[in-house]
Amino acid sequence: MPQTRSQTQATIGFPKKKLSNTLKKPNSRDCEVKLRNVQPVPTTPCVDVKLLPLSPRKRLGDDNLCNTPRLSPCSPPKLGKKENGPPRSHTWKGCRLVFDDEPTFKASPPKEQDRVRQHQIRSSSAQRSPESKADPEQKCPPEKESVCIRLFKQEGTCYQQAKLVLNTAVPDRLPAREQEMGVIRNFLKEHICGKKAGSLYLSGAPGTGKTACLSRILQDFKKEVKGFKSILLNCMSLRSAQAVFPAIAQEIGREELCRPAGKDLMRKLEKHLTAEKGPMIVLVLDEMDQLDSKGQDVLYTLFEWPWLSNSRLVLIGIANTLDLTDRILPRLEARENCKPQLLNFPPYTRNQIAAILQDRLSQVSKDQVLDSAAIQFCARKVSAVSGDIRKALDVCRRAIEIVESDVRSQTVLKPLSECKSPSESPVPKRVGLAHISQVISEVDGNRVTLSQENTQDSLPLQQKILVCSLLLLTRRLKIKEVTLGKLYEAYSSICRKQQVTAVDQSECLSLSGLLESRGLVGLKKNKESRLTKVSLKIEEKEIEHVLNGKAFTGNILAAGLP
C-alpha cells in the first residue's frame, strides 16, 4: 500500500479545560508543543505595532480592517457607486440658467484676454509635445468654463411706464385747460394775497378737469404763497348735509370747535372764521350738489359765510350741475354780494383728448406704445359720448394691459451677448386700433346692452322703459336724483301711452335694484319706499345714444313725457 502521509507528523498539545474536580497542577510536559518538519513562514516586519482588542466588536473605524490583506500601492482606489456606472458621454459641465431679472456680471477685458492667451499656450504646447499626453497628471481634461444660458423673457418696461403716465392722478401738466387755470389762479391771488373773502363755483361734466386743475394750482400756491390754510372735502363721503360742519371743524384742528353740536357748532365756526387774527382759509367742497337739503339751509349758510364782516373764508364749490346757484339757490341772485363767481369747464373735444394722450406718452420714450391711429380713434369715440378724459385714459391703459399680457406670454431663449436691457430695446408690440376697439366694445357691452336684441345680457322691456322714464324725468326736472314715487308716476304714464302693461310700485323697486346691480342707476334707500332716491350712473349722452339705436326706446325718448 503506497505511503500517502509522512509518518512523522507534528503534534500540537491544546490546553485542557479546567474543571471543578481537576485540582492537580498541569504537567509541564503536556503543555509543551513539539513541532517537527514544519518550515517557518516568513513574516513581514511590522514597523508600527498596535495592540488591538481581541473582540472585533470593540474595534472602531479602520481597526476592523486589520485582518484584511494589505493592498498593493499600485492598486486603484475603491470606486463609489456613482463612478461604477457606465462611462458618460462628454457634456458641458456647470451650465447655469440665468433669468433676466438677475444682475449679469461680466469679466473685465484684461482678465478675459489673459484667459484666452493661457488657453492658446496650452493648446500649442499640447500639439508640440505629444509625450505630455501620457502624463498621468494630465489624463483628465481641463475643466471647461460654465456656459451661461439666459432665459430671456420680454419684460416690456415700456408698457409699465406708459401705464404710469396714463393714470388718473393729478399730472404736472394739464393741456387744454390753460384758460380755466388762469381764471382760478387770478381768483386765488386776488383773495389770498389781498386777504379778501369770496366764493367761486366750478361746474362741468365729470372728467373735464375741475378737481385736477384746482388741486394742481393749490399745490403750486403752497410753495409760493404762505399764510393760508386749504381744506378739501368730498361731500360724497358725508352721511348727511349737516355733517359738513363737523368735518370742517375737524379739518381746522381746533378742539373747542369740535365739542359743540348743531347750531352751537355753526356759531363757533362763524366766530372763528370772522376773527381778526388768523390765516386765510380756502375751503374746497367737491361734489357740492350732494349737500342738497330741505330748504337748502346748508348751502345758503356756506355761501353766506364769505360775506360776513371780517370773514377770512374763500369758498370754492365743485359740482356737475351747471345751474346750481340759479336753480337751487335763487336767494343768492337777490343779494349781489353773496353771488359766487361762476366758471364752467366744457367737455374735452377730440383734438384736446388726442393732445392730452400724446403729451402723456411723450414723457416716457420717443417710441410711443400707442399708434397715432389708435389715439385718434380713442379720442373720437370718447368725445362723441361724454368728453371724459378719465375714460380715455382708462381705455388706453386697458389696451396696453392686453398687449402686455400677450408679450409676457412669449418666452424667448437668447444668448447672453444678445440680451439687451429692456430700456434700450424697441417696443416689441404696439397698441393698435383693434385693441382700442376691443376695450371700448367691452366697456360698452358690460355697462349698457340695451340695443342688442339677440344677446343674453340684454335688458328686459320693463327695465328699458324704466331707464327711459328716469332719463326723461331728470331732464325735465333738471336734477340728478328723483324719488321712486315720481319715477313710478312717469313710468306708468309712459306705459299707458305705449299700451304696455305696467308693474306695481313694489316690483318697480325690485327693477331698480336689478338696474343698480348692473351699474346703470344708483339707489339711496329710505324707510319709505316712495322716498328712495334714484339716479343715473352713466352719462345721459351715452344712454341716449344706446336707447336711440332701437325703434321702441327711440320713440319713447322722441315723444317725451306725456
Swiss-Prot record:
Similarity field: Belongs to the CDC6/cdc18 family.
Binding site for ATP: 204-211
SMART domains the UniProt entry points to: AAA (SM00382), Cdc6_C (SM01074)
Region (Disordered): 1-34, 57-140
Summary of subunit composition and partner proteins: Interacts with PCNA, ORC1, cyclin-CDK. Interacts with HUWE1. Interacts with ANKRD17. Interacts with GRWD1; origin binding of GRWD1 is dependent on CDC6. Interacts with CDT1; are mutually dependent on one another for loading MCM complexes onto chromatin. Interacts with TTC4. Interacts (via Cy motif) with CCNF; the interaction takes place during G2 and M phase. Interacts with CDH1.
Short motif (Cy): ranges: 94-101
GO cellular component: cytoplasm; cytosol; intercellular bridge; mitotic spindle; nucleoplasm; spindle; spindle midzone; spindle pole
Alphabetic keyword roster: ATP-binding, Cell cycle, Cell division, Cytoplasm, DNA replication, Mitosis, Nucleotide-binding, Nucleus, Phosphoprotein, Ubl conjugation
Post-translation changes: Ubiquitinated by the SCF(CCNF) E3 ubiquitin-protein ligase complex.
MF terms (GO), sorted A to Z: ATP binding; ATP hydrolysis activity; chromatin binding; protein serine/threonine kinase binding
PANTHER family: CELL DIVISION CONTROL PROTEIN 6 HOMOLOG, CELL DIVISION CONTROL PROTEIN 6-RELATED
Basic and acidic residues bias spans: 130-140
Record's compositionally biased regions (Polar residues): 1-11
Modified residue annotations for Phosphothreonine: 68
Subcellular localization, as worded in the UniProt entry: Nucleus; Cytoplasm
GO terms, biological process: cell division; cellular response to angiotensin; cellular response to vasopressin; DNA replication initiation; positive regulation of chromosome segregation; positive regulation of cytokinesis; positive regulation of fibroblast proliferation; regulation of mitotic metaphase/anaphase transition
CDD domains linked: AAA, Cdc6_C
Main subcellular location: nucleus
List of residues that carry Phosphoserine: 55, 72, 75, 129, 421
Entry function: Involved in the initiation of DNA replication. Also participates in checkpoint controls that ensure DNA replication is completed before mitosis is initiated.
InterPro entries referenced in this protein's UniProt entry, alphabetically: AAA+_ATPase, AAA_22, Cdc6/18, Cdc6_C, Cdc6_ORC1-like_ATPase_lid, ORC1/CDC6, P-loop_NTPase, WH-like_DNA-bd_sf
Protein name stated in the entry: Cell division control protein 6 homolog
Natural source organism: Mus musculus (Mouse)
